[in-house]
């Protein structure tokens, strides 16, 4: 597996061992599915109570104890404290800054994975169209990826099911030079 933080590998292992989907976990913690998935891949951090709820949804302490007991000699045991700390922004991957996440560190450009490459291709092909339409409809600015929501749905279609990805970001206008003052 590519270079994921320690806690992410543990979370993904637990999810797979328990036969859960990201949607199952998201519903158990009452959070959006895509955001929950981002946590599992180290692209977000959360508060301690949500981190604890995730661990509970994955089977609680008993799961981790049972999992560690099944390991063979030489395999690394999962330290539940490290997982909890990583989720809540206190892990070693946070580089000494609580909650700091190195977003995009697991991503290469262009991506080699076919699904990720298709998403990259969408931006390569339609990126300037999105940019032009944002400008025409909103003015000079950007779509925030900070004040942002996203979702993914499956849509039935007679020609084959469709993937519907929604990106919902706040429009942020660039400042007018008159607001800069004089130097």
Swiss-Prot record:
<feature type="active site">
    <location>
        <position position="118"/>
    </location>
</feature>
<comment type="similarity">
    <text>Belongs to the cyanase family.</text>
</comment>
<dbReference type="Pfam" id="PF21291">
    <property type="entry name" value="CYNS_N"/>
</dbReference>
<feature type="active site">
    <location>
        <position position="144"/>
    </location>
</feature>
<dbReference type="InterPro" id="IPR008076">
    <property type="entry name" value="Cyanase"/>
</dbReference>
<dbReference type="GO" id="GO:0009439">
    <property type="term" value="P:cyanate metabolic process"/>
</dbReference>
<feature type="active site">
    <location>
        <position position="121"/>
    </location>
</feature>
<dbReference type="GO" id="GO:0008824">
    <property type="term" value="F:cyanate hydratase activity"/>
</dbReference>
<dbReference type="InterPro" id="IPR048564">
    <property type="entry name" value="CYNS_N"/>
</dbReference>
<dbReference type="InterPro" id="IPR036581">
    <property type="entry name" value="Cyanate_lyase_C_sf"/>
</dbReference>
<keyword id="KW-0456">Lyase</keyword>
<dbReference type="Pfam" id="PF02560">
    <property type="entry name" value="Cyanate_lyase"/>
</dbReference>
<dbReference type="GO" id="GO:0003677">
    <property type="term" value="F:DNA binding"/>
</dbReference>
<dbReference type="InterPro" id="IPR010982">
    <property type="entry name" value="Lambda_DNA-bd_dom_sf"/>
</dbReference>
<comment type="function">
    <text>Catalyzes the reaction of cyanate with bicarbonate to produce ammonia and carbon dioxide.</text>
</comment>
<protein>
    <recommendedName>
        <fullName>Cyanate hydratase</fullName>
        <ecNumber>4.2.1.104</ecNumber>
    </recommendedName>
</protein>
<dbReference type="InterPro" id="IPR003712">
    <property type="entry name" value="Cyanate_lyase_C"/>
</dbReference>
């Amino acid at each position: 597996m590519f270079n994921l933080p320690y806690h992410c590998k543990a979370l993904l292992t637990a999810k797979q061992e328990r036969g859960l989907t990201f949607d199952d976990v998201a519903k158990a913690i009452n959070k959006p599915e895509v955001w929950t998935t981002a946590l599992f891949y180290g692209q977000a951090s959360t508060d301690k109570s949500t981190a604890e709820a995730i661990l509970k949804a994955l089977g609680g302490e008993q799961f981790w104890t049972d999992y560690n007991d099944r390991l063979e000699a030489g395999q690394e045991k999962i330290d539940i404290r490290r997982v909890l700390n990583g989720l809540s922004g206190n892990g070693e991957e946070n580089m000494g800054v609580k909650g700091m996440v190195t977003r995009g560190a697991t991503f290469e450009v262009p991506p080699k994975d076919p699904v990720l490459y298709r998403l990259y291709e969408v931006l390569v092909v339609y990126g300037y169209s999105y940019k032009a339409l944002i400008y025409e409809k909103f003015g000079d600015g950007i779509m925030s990826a900070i004040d942002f929501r996203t979702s993914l749905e499956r849509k039935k279609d007679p020609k084959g099911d469709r993937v519907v990805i929604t990106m919902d970001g706040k429009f942020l206008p660039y400042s007018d030079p008159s607001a800069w003052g004089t130097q």
